[in-house]
Amino acid sequence: MKNIVLTGFMGSGKTTIGKLIAEKLDIELIDTDSEVIKEFGMTIDKIFEVHGEKKFREVETKVIERVSKLENVVISTGGGVVLNPENVKLLRENGVIYFLYAPAESILKRLKDDDTRPLLKNGDKLSNIIRLLNMRMPFYKNCDFEINTDILTPELAAEKIISIHLAKESKR
């Protein structure tokens, strides 16, 4: 089975939905942010502070190179992984990419008490979310499928992705 790759903005539900899919299909979940944290031995917040976003993205791509070679896994990516076309190419070689979408206001509600997001640290959170979401949307729209996590519970979103994925797999 091709990998199920979840991408989308921070707070869109990638980790939560990824866990549900992995559990239901009894396959492994790989969270690329967690893999980057292992590489550096520090939180993403700290990585950005000490090494900067550029270094974070370089290591993220190395993680993508490694995990994209796996088969039959769920891969939950960082929200900015789609900004690098090479990452998308690698993930698509052995996977189907699902964009988990939620509007800016919903993301703000989900992240309101989360101070660990380096890209939302300075200035007005909603303005930053809108700006980043608008900048990334053309990249997200290039994914294979879009799932609106604002109108679906995590359980229903997971079921929808599984249903789409298994139908797609049966046609291969």
Curated annotation (Swiss-Prot):
A GO term from the CC aspect: cytosol
- The positions annotated for binding ATP are 11-16, 117
Q: Where does Mg(2+) bind?
A: 15
Q: In which pathway does it act?
A: Metabolic intermediate biosynthesis; chorismate biosynthesis; chorismate from D-erythrose 4-phosphate and phosphoenolpyruvate: step 5/7
Checking PROSITE patterns in the record gives: SHIKIMATE_KINASE (PS01128)
Binding residues annotated for substrate, in chain numbering: 33, 57, 79, 136
Question: Keywords, A to Z?
Answer: Amino-acid biosynthesis, Aromatic amino acid biosynthesis, ATP-binding, Cytoplasm, Kinase, Magnesium, Metal-binding, Nucleotide-binding, Transferase
| Gene Ontology molecular functions | ATP binding; magnesium ion binding; shikimate kinase activity
Give me any GO biological process, just one: aromatic amino acid family biosynthetic process
- Which prosthetic group or cofactor does it need? Mg(2+)
Catalysed conversion reaction: shikimate + ATP = 3-phosphoshikimate + ADP + H(+)
Describe the task this protein carries out: Catalyzes the specific phosphorylation of the 3-hydroxyl group of shikimic acid using ATP as a cosubstrate.
Q: Which family does it belong to?
A: Belongs to the shikimate kinase family.
- Which PANTHER family does the entry link to? SHIKIMATE KINASE (PTHR21087), SHIKIMATE KINASE 1, CHLOROPLASTIC (PTHR21087:SF16)
Q: What is this protein called?
A: Shikimate kinase
**Provenance organism:** Caldicellulosiruptor bescii (strain ATCC BAA-1888 / DSM 6725 / KCTC 15123 / Z-1320) (Anaerocellum thermophilum)
